């Protein structure tokens, strides 16, 4: 790696590191979407919900002056449970009939693949610096790109799941919005995908600049 490319690689890896932290935060948290139910005029409280890839949390909160349910950050009685298809011993009847089981399992499984690609990419990147083997940055970059693509697919599956749930005739939820976990996953996708492509370009051998040069004239990699 040439001295001019080393700073670019370090900056790119720092951006990828931020993407890794955001991706892990999104996968383990349960604020991908926030749901609000239909409100009756005589109600004084409402039960809002937020959920992620693995579990749903409901919170009973007092209605505001505008008769709206929320925001979800208001104090109230909170109850969290894992989705029944992940933990049969848990009870989540309030959500079980309105969610799409296949969508939920698919989004969670794809996110696990993303974390696996992140681990393999990080191992390659560490070996590239510790063993002075710059060529390992190329597979590392591809692993990061694959991780970003998996996150994108997981985001789209989750978005379709929420949309189908809201459109269902059996659901009690009529309003929703995506929360900070979803935003973390979106930011992680951008950082990992663009960072992986940039890292791949920076780690490629120098191309010939003149017609009489060849790739064999480039500086050897260590």
UniProtKB/Swiss-Prot annotation:
Topological domains annotated Extracellular: 30-108, 156-179
Chief localization: membrane
Disulfide bonds: 57-80
Post-translational modification: N-glycosylated.
An individual GO BP term: positive regulation of muscle contraction
Positions of transmembrane segments: 11-29, 109-129, 135-155, 180-204
Keyword terms of this UniProt record: Calcium, Calcium channel, Calcium transport, Cell membrane, Disulfide bond, Glycoprotein, Ion channel, Ion transport, Membrane, Transmembrane, Transmembrane helix, Transport, Voltage-gated channel
Tissue-specificity statement: Skeletal muscle (at protein level).
Keyword Kinase assigned: no
One Gene Ontology CC term in the entry: T-tubule
Coiled-coil residues: none
MF terms in GO: calcium channel regulator activity; voltage-gated calcium channel activity
Membrane topology: Multi-pass membrane protein
Domain of life where this protein originates: Eukaryota
Residue positions with a glycan: 43, 79
Subcellular location: Cell membrane, Sarcolemma
Residue ranges, Cytoplasmic side: 1-10, 130-134, 205-222
UniProt keyword Transferase present: no
Quaternary state and interactors: Component of a calcium channel complex consisting of a pore-forming alpha subunit (CACNA1S) and the ancillary subunits CACNB1 or CACNB2, CACNG1 and CACNA2D1. The channel complex contains alpha, beta, gamma and delta subunits in a 1:1:1:1 ratio, i.e. it contains either CACNB1 or CACNB2.
Family from the record: Belongs to the PMP-22/EMP/MP20 family. CACNG subfamily.
Functional description taken from the UniProt entry: Regulatory subunit of the voltage-gated calcium channel that gives rise to L-type calcium currents in skeletal muscle. Regulates channel inactivation kinetics.
Name of this chain's protein: Voltage-dependent calcium channel gamma-1 subunit
């Amino acid at each position: 790696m040439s001295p001019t490319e080393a700073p670019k690689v370090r900056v790119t890896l720092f951006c990828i590191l931020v993407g890794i932290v955001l991706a892990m935060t999104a996968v383990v948290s349960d604020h991908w979407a926030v749901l609000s139910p239909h409100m009756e005029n005589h109600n004084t409280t409402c039960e809002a919900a937020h959920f992620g890839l693995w579990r749903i949390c409901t919170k009973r909160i007092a209605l505001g002056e505008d008769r709206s349910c929320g925001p979800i950050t208001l104090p109230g009685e909170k109850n969290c449970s894992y989705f029944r298809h992940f933990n049969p011993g848990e009870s989540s009847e309030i959500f079980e009939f309105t969610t799409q089981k296949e969508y939920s399992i698919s989004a969670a499984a794809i996110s696990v693949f993303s974390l696996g690609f992140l681990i393999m990419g990080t191992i390659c990147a560490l070996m590239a610096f510790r063993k002075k083997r710059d060529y390992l940055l190329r597979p590392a970059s591809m692993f990061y790109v694959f991780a970003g693509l998996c996150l994108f697919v997981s985001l789209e599956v989750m978005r379709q799941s929420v949309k189908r749930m809201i459109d269902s005739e059996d659901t009690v939820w009529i309003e929703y919005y995506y929360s900070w976990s979803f935003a973390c996953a979106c930011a992680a996708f951008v950082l990992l995908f663009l960072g992986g492509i940039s890292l791949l370009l920076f780690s490629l051998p120098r191309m010939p600049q003149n017609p009489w040069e060849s790739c064999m004239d480039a500086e050897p990699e260590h």
